[in-house]
């Protein structure tokens, strides 16, 4: 007789998305570096969502390894995504105000792409998924902007400005992880004030004290290493 299990198996789930506009698809795909036939440099590469997710996952791994610079990057990323979400809502509210030009009695159905880009998404950090959700919000916003321009609710220049403002929110988030560099020093190195720590601080600058002590932290970061934080508190207390 088989032994009865008293625990459930691991939860499994899959995130799938549909992108309807070329603007959102461009933000997903980015652009590879282009080489000209004459050997000169062509267009520079542009980061897309897969590269962003890869870098965000690496930052999360470095945070798990107790690197305070990674914790600072996680906190910055969370703040940028939160701010971008608020700004996206403001853009949507502005578009809604423009759409009030349409008189009562006029019904406009939701625009649907004849063919969508269907994707399965995986991120090693919740912040990655939050950025994907922001991209989905931009895709829906872009659909409505294009529709408003088609029906003459907004002008061509307004369409250009609105789409540019929305896409810029995603690109600024991409840029925050593009600037990240692994430092390779941990809180234990800080507690010991060893050569690894001093070299890292010279190269990357000292991390924020509140982040170092775990007082400021992204809500989506791995748990802070309490043992190393306790050692750091003792070190700073002794140095007073």
PLM features per residue range, with description:
Residues 1-134, 140, 147, 166-240:
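Polar/charged low-complexity regulatory segments
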Residues 157-158:
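Short, solvent-exposed positions on alpha-helices
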